[in-house]
């Protein structure tokens, strides 16, 4: 974790931020595991916010009416191979694609209101 966190802290600093926000599909589950590992390893400098995260299950439910990763990806026009599903790397890559797709199209889908 220390090695991974070094890279995350470097990216956070280079963007002028104070903390990273975890992105995950059912992210509260992942964040709980991350926080437990941090405590177990007695890591003092966790770059991730301790209780905030972006949950693609919730965001996809709002954006596409789908909370299952495979169905949300299909609704977003992202290829999803069911044979690859549930491998940590594949699901992580698809979650990242889904998150970026939702964020990049959120305004055109009516997710932001310009009050200016």
From Swiss-Prot:
GO biological process annotation, one example: tRNA processing
List of catalytic residues: 86 (proton donor/acceptor)
Record note on quaternary structure: Homodimer.
The protein's name in its UniProt record: Ribonuclease T
Role of this protein: Trims short 3' overhangs of a variety of RNA species, leaving a one or two nucleotide 3' overhang. Responsible for the end-turnover of tRNA: specifically removes the terminal AMP residue from uncharged tRNA (tRNA-C-C-A). Also appears to be involved in tRNA biosynthesis.
Gene3D superfamilies hit by this protein: Ribonuclease H-like superfamily/Ribonuclease H
A Pfam match: RNase_T
Domain of life of the organism encoding this protein: Bacteria
GO MF terms held by the record: 3'-5' exonuclease activity; nucleic acid binding; RNA nuclease activity
Alphabetical UniProt keywords: Exonuclease, Hydrolase, Nuclease, tRNA processing
EC number: 3.1.13.-
Site (Important for substrate binding and specificity): residue numbering on this chain: 29, 51
UniProt enzyme class: hydrolase
Keyword Disulfide bond: no
Organism, as annotated: Azotobacter vinelandii
Domain Exonuclease positions: 18-99
Family the entry assigns: Belongs to the RNase T family.
One GO cellular component, as annotated: cytosol
